[in-house]
Amino acid sequence: MSIDVRAVEADDPAAVATYCALRAAVDADEADTPEGVAWEEAAYPGEVWRFLALLDGEPVGAATTGRMHVYSRDHPRFYLGLWVLPESRRRGVGTALYRAASERARAAGKEGFRCWASEAHPDAVAFVRGRGFAEEDRSKAVALDLRGLRASAPGAMPTATAPEGFSLVAIADRPDLVPGVHRVAVEAFPSIPTVTPMEPGTLEEFTARDVYRERIPLDGFFVAVETATGEAAGYANLIFAPGSTAVAHHDMTAVRPAFRGRGMATALKRATIVWALGAGLDELHANNDEENTPMRSINASLGYRSLPDEIGFTGPLAPEA
């Protein structure tokens, strides 16, 4: 039995296609696409690495590591994603990929990894725990069945109404609001309940990651605008699941602290739901940190159902050979 780990070059279409296919085969929720790889390479050049593992010449595993998109370059950890086909597990494939990713992280001066695993995948949880990873946080995953909503009585369909003194507009119609949306992120991100607050980054970084991204529909990206000043008070956007036009995730719902307590977040989230219904989507998914009770309460009030928790882990690099 031989295990060979190879780097996936972004300009190698065949290798990228194999990498994406393996991720999708192991976990459709963690799929990637060639378009997604191209976006990541353009947004984070030289900061993301991908690997394939071959068992006796057959591709059976994939991994990726690099800068976490929502943190600065000097964050002490890289993220780690690792996928091995079920029939090829417990044969050293995952360990070989972990070592390859660790070599890259060590060369970049990183002290460890951050990774995520769903309770729906106990093998993944066991793998990282067995290598010294510890749970750092936990997200409550939920989903909204849009097909069921369409089949319900017309009076049960959600509507979106802005609080008095505000309007809800799509960024597709008001691209001039993008700097204001960035200001929302700068003011709101530090106070969103989470173990490690996200960093919005510069306007350029934020725009590439959270606005003009290939899976973010701009006509489903809503901004709450104060009528009196024209300022952006909050925003909510969606991001399609990789390779899908039927399932999307709530990428962010954020409100500037000065405008909270008026039902703004609920109105914005409702706007994305109404858009998704009209666009023919089947489901919306959301993940919120366990301690983010305000947003979790909004999700519950809108009829989202619980899914298995997503666990965030931190852990060490593999020992040097």
Show which residues each predicted segment covers.
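Conserved donor-binding loop and adjoining core beta-sheet/short helix segment
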Residues: 8-13, 20-120, 233-247, 251-256
